[in-house]
Amino acid sequence: MRLPREIGPIHFVGIGGIGMSGIAEVLCNLGYTVQGSDASESANVNRLREKGIAISVGHKADNIAGADVLVVSTAIKRDNPELLAARAQRIPVVRRAEMLAELMRLKSCIAIAGTHGKTTTTSMVAALLDAGDVDPTVINGGIINAYGTNARLGAGDWMVVEADESDGTFLKLPADVAVVTNVDPEHLDHFKTFDAVQDAFRIFVENVPFYGFAVMCIDHPVVQALVGKIEDRRIITYGENPQADARLLDLKPSGAGSTFKVAFRDRKAGTAHEITDLMLPMPGPHNALNAVAAIAVAHELGLSDDTIRKALAAFGGVRRRFTKTGEWNGVTIIDDYGHHPVEIAAVLKAARQSTSAKVIAVVQPHRFTRLQSLFEEFCTCFNDADTVIVADVYPAGEAPIAGIDRDHFVLGLRAHGHREVIPLQDSASLAGVVAGVARSGDYVVCLGAGNITQWAYALPGELKALG
């Protein structure tokens, strides 16, 4: 039995969230009656309203009137008035991943998982399949620039989704193709131990049916170890590793992107094949690896080399993934979602490859618990930045932790050998600080998952206002 057409209205609590908004949009495009609520106005809320979805700002019991089902994310607390009202009225309550799983049952599905790179890789897979006239349905964790949204309903038989592992519910997703980009210690508030994180990714791959396949990056030692533990499933490995089934070769920086080729070796057939002259308009080895994952999926699904080559060269990127927000006196301002040490190091390496001048990092640490648990890693991931400007921790709903704050982080960076670390008093001070250190040719990279994105977009204008 599949999701019946007559069900509805479907009420989303926290509909403006990036994951929730994509599911709501696809359901609406399928013809279901969708409504919802969110704590505040946002671009996602406005976009969904334009599609005719009724959205209330603020959470109250009256909002769920007439709803047949309630969809909630893990961010919704158990004492949320809409959730309490639904349970009192015995209205079914489903988690976001469960509703996504229902949508996935309507198509053949590709699910992209990993601690980092999920959103970009999902977007790349979607772009390649689009170019191959597959016309996929897409539900992503970020705004795809080519679509202007994070979701679209396609007429084809395939669906491409970002599989969020943060609460373990990605194990509910019925994927025919699973991609694992990397596995690092993250979301330990849910998993408790890194061993539990690795077990979850192993189960994610083993859940793929016998007629499907997994694409896994063996450049990452934890993923390579997982490959060795998975039995009875077809796995295509990728990376620069000489043992990879899809091997990244001849990677070179080229302007604001990179060029490379991919060599395929089929273990069963004993054949080899190369896709040459590939160009990706995004900098950084990490993005080239994401592209190889997408290419491996597209190649396995039968897309031609020429289609892959053209689609990759035309890839428009994802919002908040090395996004240029403007310039000032020859200084380039970049906004990036990177908030984990591995992501930050990769983004700064990409920035270093993009300019021969200075790289200035502006970081807003995201969550006290993350800064605490990965403090050593945070103190050593800014090596490619000439200057680090440190803002206050963005709490994301967490209570402060004694000794885990901006000033402690600044001291940690200095103690680990960083030459220039500047504490930022507040966002209003940012333009003045940047103007004091940035010169023509420099890159200013704003990093974080909090409201620093607003600073990044405001910064070019604020710098110009200084004269």
UniProtKB/Swiss-Prot annotation:
GO terms for biological process?
Answer: cell division; cell wall organization; peptidoglycan biosynthetic process; regulation of cell shape
Q: Which Pfam families match?
A: Mur_ligase, Mur_ligase_C, Mur_ligase_M
Write down the top EC class of this protein.
ligase
Q: Which residues cross the membrane?
A: none
Q: Which coarse location class applies to the principal site listed for this UniProt protein?
A: cytoplasm
Q: Which reactions appear under catalytic activity for this entry?
A: UDP-N-acetyl-alpha-D-muramate + L-alanine + ATP = UDP-N-acetyl-alpha-D-muramoyl-L-alanine + ADP + phosphate + H(+)
List, alphabetically, the HAMAP family matched.
MurC
Entry's family note: Belongs to the MurCDEF family.
User: From which domain of life does this come?
Assistant: Bacteria
Recorded source organism is Rhodopseudomonas palustris (strain BisB5)
The molecular function terms of the Gene Ontology recorded here are: ATP binding; UDP-N-acetylmuramate-L-alanine ligase activity
| Protein name according to UniProt | UDP-N-acetylmuramate--L-alanine ligase
